[in-house]
Amino acid sequence: MYDLSVYDEHFFSNNQAEGLRHAEWFMPLLEGLFHFKSLVDVGCGTGHFVHWARQHGVDAWGLEGAKAGIENSLEPEKVLHFDLRVSNEIWKRGFDLALCIEVAEHIEEEYVNIFVDTLCSLSDTIVMTAAPPGQQGLCHCNEQPKEYWISLMALRGFGFDFEKTSALTEGVLAASANGFHVAPWFPNNLMVFHK
């Protein structure tokens, strides 16, 4: 099990401004595709997506495992401490959309079923990314191809939504072409699932 303390105050303060800029272009794209009134961001860091959503009238919550993320949260009342490796049902499909960006590859394979069960319990629509083999990154311990995640979600009755994934990917690529900073891995790692 890796040490969550690598995600300290320094890590989150260095990423805060970029996270807010990311939210400014990514969240309107999501809203345009999914028209959500409620959202949960799983592995939300300091809650920049939650913050944007709440500023725009969305009932938004965040789940975060690193205490420094919560302590530096933009929405301290709405970001809850949560270990994604421990089975704990918080809400059962209570949200219009569950968002899980840059998290899946950080969950050790022995805990993946708990992680996926948690995601599937939160919403009937899930937008996530997952790093493929070879991407590498801080504390990446479970890089898997998309087919791995698609199979796990299918076992729980969630289908891979090719149309929405393509539309979202095109929107991200358009944002990049328009000058917004987009991590090079981001468009390729996107997946949308629907039950």
Language model features with spans:
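Conserved N-terminal segment of class I S-adenosyl-L-methionine
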Residues: 1-101, 110-122, 133-136, 142-148, ...
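A short His-aromatic
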Residues: 106-107
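Short glycine-centered segments of the SAM/dcSAM-binding site in methyltransferase folds
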Residues: 125-127
